[in-house]
Amino acid sequence: MVAKDQKPILVKNSDEGLIIKKISKSFSGRPVVREVEFQFKCGEAIGLLGPNGSGKTTLFYTIIGLIKPDSGSIILDGEDITDLPIYKRSKNGIGYLPQEASIFRGLTVEDNIKAILEILEEDKQKVEEEIDHLLKEFDIDHLRRTPALSLSGGERRRVEIARCLASHPKYILLDEPFAGIDPIAVGEIRELVSHLKERGVGVLITDHNVRETLTLIDRAVLIHEGSVLIEGEPNDIVGNEDVRKVYLGDRFSI
């Protein structure tokens, strides 16, 4: 859980947002993503959803910088970042948490966060101050000297998010955050996403657990056969007949 008495460091955001503009991608001549467009701003949680083979994963990796689109552009606060590699996108404000554990298992919790901060900040006192703040904000101060290898799934995720926030991202992209975790950890993920929004961080989630995803996002973009089938609030998505036909089924509810 997130500490309630620790004020988060708010993101200095822009009104321009993250814009996905007519992104297309083909593999071996087969179109996978077809002129997809949507945008979101800091403080919003957006779900990128769709059936298997819809193109959503390719699109997600294109936004991260792992796949280069054939056409279209990705605009971050007015700057075209389409051709930037993933590490430069990180410097510009896009954080990424993969489905797989990304924690440095050989380090303690404190040193996991310090490893990022020492790259970004030369002032050792400021490094220590921010470590203290993040440890308290995410209620992991008692785990400060605990080896990362011994953390539970929920604890590990909190450390990974705290470490990601050490680079002061404006947006965080979460890949399958609900995969392979127990109900208690699901509740923690929901709380963490809410906390990121309070911080002013924009959150983009792609996950096969559509029910959990729809209950915590503001809007969803549903991809079908490489194109946007519908974009809207969760209730709009669930109530759409085409969505039920190709993705949710008639009995789905949230």
Regions found by a protein language model. Give the residues of each.
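Conserved ABC ATPase "signature" region
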Residues: 114, 125-143, 191-194
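Helix-to-loop junction immediately C-terminal to a conserved catalytic motif
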Residues: 64
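Conserved catalytic motifs of ABC-family nucleotide-binding domains
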Residues: 168
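The feature captures the beta-strand-to-loop junction immediately N-terminal to the Walker
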Residues: 49-51
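Catalytic Walker B motif of ABC-type/P-loop ATPase nucleotide-binding domains
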Residues: 172-176
